[in-house]
């Protein structure tokens, strides 16, 4: 039976309303039963993963020997723990196949099941020793003619998407049925409780997030955008911008949802980065769905992320996401730019700007 829990204010005075559990809210909103079962399975795994992350400095699991996964990324002991927890939970749900960052190819679970899940079990694990928020990112999509091809459909095929954040609070941001909701894990009830429904990205926030240390590798279009922001009120944009960079995709996305602004992880000229660095299927696609259903946008700089299809399970893509107008500004600077990467003094980029 779906449950509702009375909440208690930190002052120990009861609040004047009830907050629904994840299970109760999904049921009350008429969510598809199969999608709901997958989301609840992921929430079960996230509860245990949050516990293990919280005690990692005491258990030593965050100091385990690092290996390299099939995609060439450093894999910590907690990455493997997270992957195992998520897979075990999903095997009990109506899931045909699982594509994880930690595996080479999709795992077939039950070919007769209706859904497939793409997942980054522990995004940003390198941040753990610095006590920075990390997360789990997931995409739920219908099973196609076979498990592998299901993950090669465009992002518009997704039925739901979301991410867990393991930080000051453990929370779930969930995009389902064209809305985005926030749930927080109650520390004593051990339930994900609805905290905010129908999230909309605040508009016109003058903030951008990018790793500025890579400036020398950026395309001229990205350099021009950042330079115009940094020029402040005296520059072509006529206002002062703040710059953010947490180096945690889930934390950056959460901030965008709460505060607005734009996040950029563009392609750059380094080997292995020319098609972007984030994975399309289990990072860019789910983030794009969340952004769009919260009234924002997500682009590669040249195309809508949700219209892109992967050619391989771990294909990478650039990601620019956030406020519709700010994302559009970045896109406009990319229009007609071929090739994308030029020397910093190329005449095209010396002249081209959004306002000139």
UniProtKB/Swiss-Prot annotation:
Keyword Cytoplasm applies: yes
Identification of the protein by name: Fructose-1,6-bisphosphatase class 1
Gene behind the chain: fbp
PANTHER family linked: FRUCTOSE-1,6-BISPHOSPHATASE-RELATED (PTHR11556), SEDOHEPTULOSE-1,7-BISPHOSPHATASE, CHLOROPLASTIC (PTHR11556:SF35)
Residues noted as binding Mg(2+) 1 in the record, renumbered to the chain: 101, 120, 122
Co-factor note (free text): Binds 2 magnesium ions per subunit.
Cross-referenced HAMAP family: FBPase_class1
Subunit and interaction comment: Homotetramer.
Alphabetic keyword roster: Calvin cycle, Carbohydrate metabolism, Cytoplasm, Hydrolase, Magnesium, Metal-binding
Alphabetized SUPFAM superfamilies for the sequence: Carbohydrate phosphatase (SSF56655)
Metabolic or biological pathway, per its Swiss-Prot or TrEMBL entry: Carbohydrate biosynthesis; Calvin cycle
InterPro entries, sorted: FBPase_C_dom, FBPase_class-1, FBPase_N, FBPtase, Fructose_bisphosphatase_AS
Family in the record: Belongs to the FBPase class 1 family.
Record bears the keyword Chaperone: no
Known EC number: 3.1.3.11
Pfam families: FBPase (PF00316), FBPase_C (PF18913)
Native organism: Bradyrhizobium sp. (strain ORS 278)
Major localisation: cytoplasm
Cofactor: Mg(2+)
Enzyme class, UniProt record, top EC level: hydrolase
GO-annotated biological processes: fructose 1,6-bisphosphate metabolic process; fructose 6-phosphate metabolic process; fructose metabolic process; gluconeogenesis; reductive pentose-phosphate cycle; sucrose biosynthetic process
Segments for region (Disordered): 1-26
